[in-house]
Structure formats: C-alpha cells, structure tokens
Amino acid sequence: MGALYCLAGLPGSGKTTFAESFLSEHPGMEYFSPDQYYEKINGDECDRRNTFEVWHAMFGDIHKAEVEGKDVLIDSDNITYAQRTQWLEWFPNFEAHHLMYFERPFELCLERVNSRRRTIPKEVMLAKLGAWDSPVDAPDRHRWDSVVCL
C-alpha cells in the first residue's frame, strides 16, 4: 500500500515549491492539488467556479491511487484541524499518513501571494491566518504517522 503525504500551510508559505522538489526526489508519486483540477475543469486555475466538481474529481483520483497502492502528495492549504482530519477519514487505507506543515511569517506569505497571477485579498489571508490550527497542538496529531514542520 502507498503512503499519503499531506501539506498544510497558508497560501504563500512554500507548499507548492516544496512539492516540486519533493516530487523530483520521489518518482512515481502522484500529485494532487485543487489548482490542477480548477485548471482541468474550468480551463483556468484562477476560475474558482464548480467547486463541488473540482473536489469530487480530485477525491476520486486520490481514491483510485489509494486502491492502486500509490504514494500521493496532497498540496492544499489544509489550515484547520477538520480539513486535515478529512484526509485520514476519507483515505484510511494508505499504509501511512504523513503531515508536513509550513509556518511562515504572515507578511512573507502575503507578499508571495501578491506576486502571483491569482492573488488573494489581505482580508481573506487574515481570515485564513485566524483559522490556522497549528498541528503542534492538534487533537489529531497522534493519528498521523509523522508530523513535520518544514
């Protein structure tokens, strides 16, 4: 059976940059990001319509990888305990579940997000910061095979 690697952190914290490097070191690993699915379904990752279809397609593909015993990397914000726990509950048949999280200064994240094609308003970023549940004290920490701050 494969392993599930889940990234967590604010937008702009370095998740996707890390993912690119991690994937190059782990050939054959499947990569899943909502941005990919917005691009595939809507034709543009900035077009945030069809949210249900995007997540439904992504979850279906992750399930297929789980059944096939593949390793997967999930690149999404996963800022709350509930968002992270869903991966454990929906995909329990992976051999291992690893959480890798990023805590960066808010202003750095905001600066990085504002340099992208798809920007996020400061108010939305502040709301995400306020919702951030640090994995250090999370009640589900013991359910992960490893929890690493990168």
Q: At which residue positions do the language-model features occur?
A:
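Short strand-turn motif at the edge of the Rossmann-like AdoMet-binding core
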Residues: 36, 76-78
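ATP-dependent NMP and nucleoside kinases share a basic, alpha-helical "lid"
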Residues: 40-44, 66, 79-118
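Conserved substrate/cofactor phosphate-moiety recognition/catalytic segment
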Residues: 17-70, 108-110
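Conserved Rossmann-like nucleotide-binding pocket used by diverse enzymes
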Residues: 6, 32, 75
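Soluble or luminal CAZymes and related metallo-dependent hydrolases
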Residues: 50-57, 79, 83, 124
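Conserved GTP-binding G-domain of TRAFAC-class P-loop NTPases and closely related GTPase folds
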Residues: 2-8, 13-16, 21, 25, ...
